[in-house]
């Protein structure tokens, strides 16, 4: 553990994720590009991309870990794929997201479901400083634009007094086991290789 603490987590993360690229363009680096991307996708996102719905058992597992009547901070809540079902068993939820378009969709869903225990905040996680006495923090695929990962994870740990869950979608091709059997190469996203190190060094 002592050796792990000496590792410069941010340096490794930034290298693996291309933050040191000479040409900095696209969603990762440009807020306006990112906002336009979500403005277009937001109305259809919940229907097309919903991990809570599509990954069997994930929602139940999170429910089991968080328990009933807890205060949840949802980092990168988006349109509420996880926020909405969690609100039905939580005391209250603070939903933080950088996209106004996605937060509008969240508001529509909350009204449709008759839920009043969710407050939405428009903010990047890096800039978020609002006081909130959370029991747990949930982050689902929401840290991909973070440059300083150590600071982002330490903030999550500070807010989640009882703990936190990070959900990350693995970048593997469909039927990847078949690729392995045939000794075919396929691309992996290196940030998932770094996640265990992040937990060890930051928490």
Predicted features, each with a name:
Residues 127-132:
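Short conserved loop adjoining the S-adenosyl-L-methionine
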Residues 136-148:
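A short SAM/SAH-binding and catalytic strip from SAM-dependent methyltransferases
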Residues 2-66, 69-78, 165-191:
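Conserved class I S-adenosyl-L-methionine
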Residues 79-126:
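Class I SAM-dependent methyltransferase SAM/SAH-binding core
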Residues 150-164:
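A short glycine-rich, Lys/Arg-flanked "PGG" loop and its adjoining helix->strand segment in the class I
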Residues 192-203:
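Short alpha-helix
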